[in-house]
UniProtKB/Swiss-Prot annotation:
A Pfam family of this chain: Oxidored_nitro
The protein's annotated pathway: Porphyrin-containing compound metabolism; bacteriochlorophyll biosynthesis (light-independent)
Annotated family: Belongs to the BchN/ChlN family.
Cofactor binding note: Binds 1 [4Fe-4S] cluster per heterodimer. The cluster is bound at the heterodimer interface by residues from both subunits.
BP terms from Gene Ontology: light-independent bacteriochlorophyll biosynthetic process; photosynthesis, dark reaction
Binding residues annotated for [4Fe-4S] cluster, in chain numbering: C21, C46, C103
Catalysed reactions, semicolon-separated: chlorophyllide a + oxidized 2[4Fe-4S]-[ferredoxin] + 2 ADP + 2 phosphate = protochlorophyllide a + reduced 2[4Fe-4S]-[ferredoxin] + 2 ATP + 2 H2O
Keywords: 4Fe-4S, ATP-binding, Bacteriochlorophyll biosynthesis, Chlorophyll biosynthesis, Iron, Iron-sulfur, Metal-binding, Nucleotide-binding, Oxidoreductase, Photosynthesis
Residue stretches in coiled coil: none
Organism annotation: Chlorobium phaeobacteroides (strain DSM 266 / SMG 266 / 2430)
Taxonomic placement: Bacteria, Pseudomonadati, Chlorobiota, Chlorobiia, Chlorobiales
Molecular function per GO: 4 iron, 4 sulfur cluster binding; ATP binding; metal ion binding; oxidoreductase activity, acting on iron-sulfur proteins as donors; oxidoreductase activity, acting on the CH-CH group of donors, iron-sulfur protein as acceptor
Its biological purpose: Component of the dark-operative protochlorophyllide reductase (DPOR) that uses Mg-ATP and reduced ferredoxin to reduce ring D of protochlorophyllide (Pchlide) to form chlorophyllide a (Chlide). This reaction is light-independent. The NB-protein (BchN-BchB) is the catalytic component of the complex.
Assembly and binders: Protochlorophyllide reductase is composed of three subunits; BchL, BchN and BchB. Forms a heterotetramer of two BchB and two BchN subunits.
The protein's name in its UniProt record: Light-independent protochlorophyllide reductase subunit N
Length: 420
């Protein structure tokens, strides 16, 4: 058990992380960096995973692909990818190619860094991104992508003070964050990542890095150490509570004092119906996306009873403010899933936020579930994301209230004649 400031205790258990493969990051990163191509060195399993997870047909020519490892490749010293790289350049004309690792070639001890350097040119760099599920939670693969981009961020001179938002968000959310910062008088240096490879932000000793995703601690530390940038330690901008604190703390970094309590109250007022439904509900968060801490904090402040908040990894410094806001909540790192099953059966929570792997079994036992993956894909940041965030939590509760109980005959009527 670990103690963090504010008398919050983190219970450390012994489980491997039940999570999507890190290759899933391709789904949002290739859409964000619009002149990129993501190449995965993997197996047929990787191909089936991406085909099903991303729902992209091959004739759509998406800006990602898989170089398949066959049985014959197991005896080779290193895979040969020159022809594939040439084909990618001819078909897609990318400005950068990300070479992602997967489990099998990592077990084979493929030298990915050497391979990427060999394939890289000045015109089209090939950047290695460790993304296999052997090491990282799937959202941390975005951290690895940003890690690879750091050398391509210009060095900002001393005295050039502005904010760089850290984390991939869609263009509409990026516009909202930029507009809000400028309205508060905060100079904006850009986003990491930007939508084009040649537009990555300049980062230097007077840059303030504002993480907007809670799973980017490694790249934040790298920029802090290598560029001398200052990392904003605050709540993440999810929900009225987190958004107010985030913007007030960020403004303070620039010597600007703002009081956004009225705006926070107005945001809570907009989701009164949702919070009324959440109030008093027992919510259980299993480890998956590493977004669990800020989501649990929002639920707690919305009046729900968070019976457990578990996460794959917790960084006591990077997540310090979120942990302080969770006083009184059971917080577990790398939870033992078998223990969680027993606790869920005993506690009978009203809502479980869980992974795609465990959602259907929980639903089959009569629990109301929400896929944690959905919080990754929806625009839930800052003031504009308050209503979408609240709706994500209440939609399964509203749906269940309109459905008959699982033991009613309506569920098998006309489906299995032998069961009638």
């Amino acid at each position: 058990m670990m103690q963090v400031p504010g008398d919050v205790q983190i219970i450390k258990e012994d489980n491997v992380t039940h999570s999507f493969c890190g290759l899933a990051c391709v789904g949002w990163m290739y859409q964000k960096i619009k002149d990129s191509f993501f190449l995965i060195l993997g197996t047929h399993t990787c191909a089936h995973f991406l085909q099903n997870a991303l729902g992209m047909m091959i004739f759509a020519k998406p800006r990602f692909g898989i170089a398949l490892i066959e049985e014959g490749d197991l005896s080779k010293h290193e895979p040969t990818l020159e022809e594939i790289i040439s084909e990618i350049k001819a078909d897609h004309n990318p400005s950068v190619i990300f070479l992602l690792s997967s489990c099998t070639p990592e077990v084979m001890k493929v030298d990915f860094k050497g391979l990427a350097n060999q394939l890289s040119t000045d015109e089209v760099p090939v950047l290695f991104v460790p993304a296999s599920g052997l090491v990282y939670n799937f959202t941390q693969a975005e951290d690895s992508v940003l890690h690879a981009l750091v050398p391509f961020c210009p060095v900002a001179p001393a005295g050039q003070k502005n904010v760089v938002f850290l984390g991939s968000v869609n263009d509409a959310t990026a516009d909202d964050l930029r507009a809000e910062a400028e309205a508060l008088g905060i100079p904006v240096g850009g986003f990491l990542p930007e939508s084009r490879f040649d537009k990555m932000p300049a980062i230097g000793p007077d840059t303030v890095l504002a993480p907007v995703q809670p799973y980017l601690s490694r790249v934040a530390v790298k920029l802090e150490r290598e560029r001398g940038a200052r990392v904003l330690h605050s709540l993440f901008p999810f929900g009225p509570d987190g958004t107010r604190v985030f913007w007030e703390d960020l403004a303070r970094e620039f010597g600007i004092t703002v009081d956004l309590r009225d705006r926070e109250k107005a945001a809570w007022d907009k989701i009164q119906k949702q919070t009324a439904l959440l109030r008093g509900k027992k919510v259980f968060l299993t480890a998956d996306t590493m977004m669990e801490l800020p989501l649990a904090r929002f639920l707690k402040n919305a009046g729900a009873e968070v019976v457990e908040c578990s996460s794959a990894y917790i960084n006591k410094k990077f997540h310090a403010h979120e942990l302080e806001a969770l006083q009184g909540v059971r917080v577990v790192e790398q939870p033992n899933f078998h223990r969680q099953l027993e606790d869920v059966t005993r506690i009978q929570p009203d809502l479980i936020i869980t992974s795609l792997m465990t959602a259907n079994p929980f639903a089959g036992h009569g629990f109301v579930v929400k896929w944690s993956m959905e919080f990754m894909l929806m625009p839930i940041h800052s003031w504009s994301g308050v209503i979408p965030l609240a709706n994500l939590f209440v939609s399964p509760l509203q749906r269940r209230s309109k459905l008959p109980a699982f033991d009613k005959d309506v569920w098998i009527e006309g489906v299995m004649p032998s069961a009638e």
